[in-house]
Amino acid sequence: VNLTIILAVLSVGLWSGLLLSIIAPVTAFFFTGSPIMAAIPLMFPAVMAGNAVLAITVWYFQKKTSFKWRLPAGLIAGSILKAIFMGVVIVLIILPIFGDNIALKLPKPEALPVVLATAKVTFSITQLTTALIGSALAYVIWMPLKKYLKVEN
């Protein structure tokens, strides 16, 4: 998802990346049926906003700065800011307030502490890792792709 959002921003523009930021969590939910997302609908806008942070940061560094390594810097900054945003909003605010709702969606409600611990890692450390991996892949794909897109225009 991160790779797709980044490539959309770089090749089509900010609005396409923002659109994907909104669509991706909903689409993912339809395929995975996450009990956490089902139990706490407030997670959807939080994930959407985290994706948007990545898109806006990459766009800002690419379009509004002029130093040599602006794209790698934007990719790294966007990944870090996304993880921080999601860590604060989801891990420190949403899960402590609404975490008990998850037990209602679990086949074994007694598994709630393990599910919450996993969710805290998923929405912080894992977000950073996947955003950095997506950023690295986007960079590798973007370098030859941008030359092709310039030729086509």
Map each language-model feature to its residues.
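Loop-helix junctions at membrane interfaces
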Residues: V1-N153
